[in-house]
């Protein structure tokens, strides 16, 4: 793996999608080739799976096991079609959710057997693992407030995963805490209830040492200094 692989994680409304785009823009300003993907999704097959998982009118009876397998089917396609080739070219990959989401949501949230979850993830990703995972954390109250605000702007877009009860999301949050405790070198928890600028500054401090180890880009935006 010649490039750099960064993932964003967090419960709903944590701001990870916004921060992923801000980081992409900043890295591009420094001259790096950056690709941002979302999960589930990121490929034509993955986007079809995403619709089935989140927005389809026919997914109400979906079982936790089916959800687990579909998530990882999308992931397996993304890893092989997009992530591995881009990393081999030396590019920076930013992924809005990756396998930690499956551990947190399907493992802890849906209460599936964690060892089974890990084995299925292993099939999907193999040795393609992020170097840095940024876990954005907000309180349940802020998460709920942001979700309501987002749903108000998109009233006709149903998201099945956002319809779970509060106990489910509490289990997900606990799952993320367990993941961070298990892999503290990779997973960094950031308080994300502040301004997006302050959160981005904290993210940049973690990313900067990693990009310093990459080959220096040959071209940079005008007026942008090298790392």
What is the meaning of each model-derived region?
Residues 2-5:
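Pre-Walker A (Motif I) flank of P-loop NTPase domains
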Residues 16:
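Conserved lysine of the Walker
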Residues 95-97, 126-149:
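Conserved phosphate-donor/acceptor-positioning beta-strand/loop module used by diverse small-molecule
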Residues 22-24, 141-227:
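NTP-dependent small-molecule kinase module
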Residues 30-125, 202:
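ATP-dependent small-molecule kinase phosphotransfer cores
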Residues 19:
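Hydrophobic positions on the alpha1 helix immediately C-terminal to the Walker A/P-loop
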Residues 8:
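Hydrophobic anchor at the beta1->P-loop junction of P-loop NTPases
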Residues 13:
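Walker A (P-loop) phosphate-binding loop of P-loop NTPases
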């Amino acid at each position: 793996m010649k490039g750099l692989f960064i993932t964003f994680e967090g419960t709903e409304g944590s701001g990870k999608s916004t921060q992923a785009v801000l980081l992409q823009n900043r890295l591009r300003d420094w001259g790096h080739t950056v690709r941002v993907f979302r999960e589930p999704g990121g490929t034509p097959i993955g986007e079809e799976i995403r619709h089935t998982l989140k927005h389809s009118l026919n997914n109400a009876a979906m079982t936790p096991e089916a959800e687990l397998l579909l998530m990882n089917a999308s992931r397996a396609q993304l890893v092989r079609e997009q992530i591995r080739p881009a990393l081999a070219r030396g590019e920076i990959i930013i992924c809005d959710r990756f396998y930690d989401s499956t551990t947190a949501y399907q493992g802890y949230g849906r209460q599936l057997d964690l060892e089974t979850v890990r084995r299925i993830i292993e099939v999907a990703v193999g040795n393609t693992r992020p170097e840095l995972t940024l876990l954005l954390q907000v309180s349940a109250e802020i998460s709920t407030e942001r979700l309501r605000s987002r749903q108000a702007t998109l009233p006709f877009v149903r998201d099945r995963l956002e319809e779970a009860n509060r106990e489910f999301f509490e289990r997900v949050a606990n799952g993320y805490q367990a993941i961070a405790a298990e892999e503290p070198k990779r997973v960094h928890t950031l308080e994300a209830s502040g301004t997006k600028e302050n959160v981005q500054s904290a993210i940049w401090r973690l990313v900067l040492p990693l990009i310093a180890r990459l080959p220096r880009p040959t071209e940079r935006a005008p007026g942008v200094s090298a790392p």
